[in-house]
Amino acid sequence: MRLLRFLAPLSLALAAGLPAQEHAPAPKRPIDWPALEREGVAVLRDYLRVNSTNPPGSELEAARFLRDFLAKEGIEAQILDTVELGAGRANLYARVKGNGSKRAIALVHHMDVVPAAASSWSVPPFSGMLRDGFIYGRGALDMKSEGIAQLMAVVALKRGGVPLTRDLVIIANPDEEWGSTGALTFADKHADLLRDVEFLFTEGGTNSVRNDTLLFRGIGVSEKRTFWQRLTVRGTPSHASRPTKDNPVPRLVAALDRLAKYETPLHVTPGVDRYFRDISRDYPGERGQWLRNVSSSLADPRAREWILSDVYWNAILRNTISLTGLQGSNKTNVIPPEASAEVDIRLLPDQNPDSVLATLKAVVADTAVRFTPLIVPKTPFESETNTDFFRAVERVSREHDPRAFVTSTMLTGATDRPMYRRLGIQVYGVDPFRTNDVDFQRGVHGND
């Protein structure tokens, strides 16, 4: 992960987003940005050395690391929910007071990381190595870097004595990568700590970068809902040398073939419509016209083919189905008693899970195929763009990247944002780094 001027834009976004004036208030004390960035790099490298692989998580050590760092800055942080979350796990909460004239803003990140196969890395995955301007480590992209950027932004404002009209709330959750139990527990148990929070930002932004130039900054206002299913067919076990008609494997394969060939309907949500209208400025001629009115353009075969050829655009315009796992016999010469498949289904925010499931069962058209949910879809949301926070990001982005614009985006993956959105908080995904979506997706759970 390369750090490129991330502290100043993020800090100023916070400061400019708090008062109503056009520009951020000046610090009472000078802020040495280069020194602060060097310090942020050092803190991030130390944070990456805390192994918080999930499972099992062990985020309590990470929470203590953050608490101790904040304590050195005179910011008291609380470690919460160690009993509820189980051994080695915890939430972290801190608050920097403003003058209270406006509601608070929350900066949230998750402390856990996905497993890393050390044999596939060129460096130890928990070394926090700095090489050729890049920091290597599991979590450098997802999302310890943004967590430290958030903390250093708050530290910059505090050291600079920048007057705040809103409290700044810092939250670090465990278990985002597995079950979101950290955010769920925090939102359920500590809603009183969030009652005055108007805006919350965390991961989930999508930027477009070309040749190190930011084309647009995508603020995540929604995300798709995870609706994983297991499909199972039962049969009679027997020796494979004598084929039977109730072998569950070919019956399951036939069902999966029908599912794989099914084209889910296209649907344009309001945030996605704005996204296409905004990015149309980067596409001259006919293609720009298609994007400016994407709903009607999808009825044009040529426009439809071009638009859906982009895997991200395709994913934000429909529910998606990916066949990801198969289980049959554990021996070649045995017809198994059961065959199953796991299917990754992602729903657009405004889609009804029960209706989608009924449609998929009709597509499979076989009552012998049993559908079992593997995960309950989270609360759907689409946050507003006509807000002080969104306008603050637009102002600061113009100051630092005048040629780039800000738009709303939909995340095709999942975050902890729904846990907080159901409390009435406007939640946003913000990527403060100059990282394009292709590199981000390749590296976020990948090697090095």
Question: What are the residue ranges of the model-derived segments?
Answer:
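Bacterial N-terminal signal peptides
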Residues: 5-17
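Metal-dependent amide/peptide-bond hydrolase catalytic core
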Residues: 21-28, 206-215, 219-448
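Acidic/His- and Gly-rich active-site-bordering loop/insert found
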Residues: 22-138, 144-147, 157-166, 343
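Extracytoplasmic/secreted proteins, especially bacterial periplasmic and envelope-associated proteins
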Residues: 35, 39-43, 61, 65, ...
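Sec-exported extracytoplasmic/periplasmic mature domains
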Residues: 45-53, 67-76, 155-159, 188-192, ...
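Solvent-exposed loop/turn segments at secondary-structure junctions
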Residues: 53-55, 87, 98-101, 111-115, ...
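Short, solvent-exposed loop/turn segments at the edges of secondary structure
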Residues: 89, 102, 123, 165, ...
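Acidic/histidine-rich catalytic neighborhood of metal-dependent amide-processing enzymes
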Residues: 134-135, 141-219
